[in-house]
Amino acid sequence: MLPARPEPLSVAVEETAVVVVDMQNAYASPGGYLDIAGFDISGAKAAISAIAETVEAARAAGVTVIYFQNGWDKDYVEAGGPGSPNWHKSNALKTMRKKPELQGQLLAKGGWDYALVDQLAPQPGDIVVPKPRYSGFFNSQFDSILRARGIRNLVFCGIATNVCVESTLRDGFHLEYFGILLEDATHQAGPEYVQKAAIYNVETFFGWVSTVADFRRAFAQIPPKED
């Protein structure tokens, strides 16, 4: 049983995955896209440490670990042109239009910005899922990966709470997945109030909210699944 708000949730190891959302240099490192675009990334360091604890506990318990990587091809065809809302709303794309010297650097596959941070390198058995939009369910193999493994419970951590994390958790709700947000293993893009708003939305409408400590305790009590 995982302690959570608004109530505890029963989670079986074989039906659970930890979903690490967009822990890339773009979102968590100085000189990455969010930093260049003017967002406060000071909370990213704590999030990295908390996520490292989470995935360590997950692997020890036999819980599937899935990483998202957000971005596009180096020519940004996958990002969409002026006919796409993403072209207008993506702060990475807007930043590159304002600063043409950055063209081809932000969230481009194969580049430093796109890469996962060194502290959270995937391990053997982990799954990495590329995604081209905020929600990890859109135009990706994520749903198929989950259904093939019988996974129903998604434990979310990563950046940004109010954008890609919440977008994916919401879509999961509509696809009948149980979404759990580890509030102390996330960081928002924007002021502190958007973090609180995202947590409120999850707890009240779309899922459950827990902590890294509660996750670690809950899964330490569950024997690892056998191969």
From Swiss-Prot:
Gene3D superfamilies: Isochorismatase-like. Keywords: Hydrolase. GO terms for biological process: nitrogen utilization; uracil catabolic process. Its EC number is 3.5.1.110. GO terms for molecular function: hydrolase activity, acting on carbon-nitrogen (but not peptide) bonds, in linear amides. Hydrolyzes ureidoacrylate to form aminoacrylate and carbamate. The carbamate hydrolyzes spontaneously, thereby releasing one of the nitrogen atoms of the pyrimidine ring as ammonia and one of its carbon atoms as CO2. InterPro entries: Isochorismatase-like_dom, Isochorismatase-like_hydrls, Isochorismatase-like_sf, RutB. Belongs to the isochorismatase family. RutB subfamily. It is an enzyme of class 3 (hydrolase). This is Ureidoacrylate amidohydrolase RutB. It holds the Pfam family Isochorismatase. The active site is at D22 (proton acceptor), K131, C164 (nucleophile). It catalyses: (Z)-3-ureidoacrylate + H2O + H(+) = (Z)-3-aminoacrylate + NH4(+) + CO2; (Z)-3-ureidoacrylate + H2O = (Z)-3-aminoacrylate + carbamate + H(+); (Z)-2-methylureidoacrylate + H2O + H(+) = (Z)-2-methylaminoacrylate + NH4(+) + CO2.
